[in-house]
């Protein structure tokens, strides 16, 4: 199995090769030779960027693991090298509401600090509900929760232009909605953080 760093390097190399090939094809006069050269350069840049990105994300992951220890928040690294925070409903929002609970604020405070230290990342916040209520109500509520989370981060210095939000309602359960405990699992907020590959490629190329 690949380590997180090796996975990041491999992912970055693949993206870099694709970008390099595209750049060579669009901007060059040398046909296939130019494309191959662009792909080779892109692969080198992509490999460096993937390693660099993985290292930065690993640091942020460690910070958030320490900040959320014992809270029920799950901090993981996704297969595509994004940082994922899964926040359960018992610490984030009361039933049927989009107001951030006090326990969630302290987590978001630390999270905002890690985001301002790494300004090249982008953030996706997705709200989820259980199957109680109508689709229209759940879609609206899940979006409002994502929006509340974004606004809280923005008030603590995170540029809102970096943050995308969505409400998926009850459509992506992680447990069968057959018990109160399982419904509570489905009421959650997921936050994904990703390093911008384009920005990192530009940083490496500038060196």
How should each PLM-predicted stretch be described?
Residues 57-84:
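Amphipathic, membrane-active segments
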Residues 72, 93-127, 154, 191, ...:
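Periplasmic peptidoglycan-binding/anchoring modules of Gram-negative envelope and division proteins
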Residues 9, 14-21, 35, 59, ...:
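Extracytoplasmic/secreted proteins, especially bacterial periplasmic and envelope-associated proteins
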Residues 69, 78-80, 88-90, 96-98, ...:
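Solvent-exposed coil/turn segments that connect beta secondary-structure elements
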Residues 1-61:
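Short, low-complexity, glycine-enriched hydrophobic/amphipathic alpha-helices that associate
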Residues 74-76, 82-88, 92, 122-126, ...:
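Soluble periplasmic/extracytoplasmic beta-strand elements of cell-envelope proteins
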């Amino acid at each position: 199995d690949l380590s997180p760093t090796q996975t990041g390097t491999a992912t970055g190399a693949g993206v870099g090769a694709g970008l390099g090939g595209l750049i060579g094809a669009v901007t060059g006069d040398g046909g296939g030779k130019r494309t191959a050269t662009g792909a080779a350069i892109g692969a080198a840049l992509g490999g460096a960027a993937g390693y660099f990105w993985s290292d930065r994300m690993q640091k942020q992951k460690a910070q958030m693991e320490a900040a959320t220890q014992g809270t029920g928040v799950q901090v993981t690294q996704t297969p595509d090298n994004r940082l994922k925070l899964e926040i359960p409903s018992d610490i984030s929002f009361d039933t049927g509401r989009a107001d951030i609970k006090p326990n969630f604020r302290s987590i978001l405070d630390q999270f905002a600090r890690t985001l301002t230290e790494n300004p090249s990342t982008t953030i996706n916040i997705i709200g989820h509900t259980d199957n109680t209520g109508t689709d229209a109500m759940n879609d609206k509520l899940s979006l409002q929760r994502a929006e509340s989370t974004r606004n809280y981060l923005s008030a603590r210095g995170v540029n809102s232009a970096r943050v995308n939000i969505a409400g998926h309602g009850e459509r992506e359960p992680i447990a069968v909605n057959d018990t109160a405990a399982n419904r509570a699992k489905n009421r959650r907020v997921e936050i994904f953080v990703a390093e911008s590959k384009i920005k990192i490629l530009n940083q490496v190329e500038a060196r």
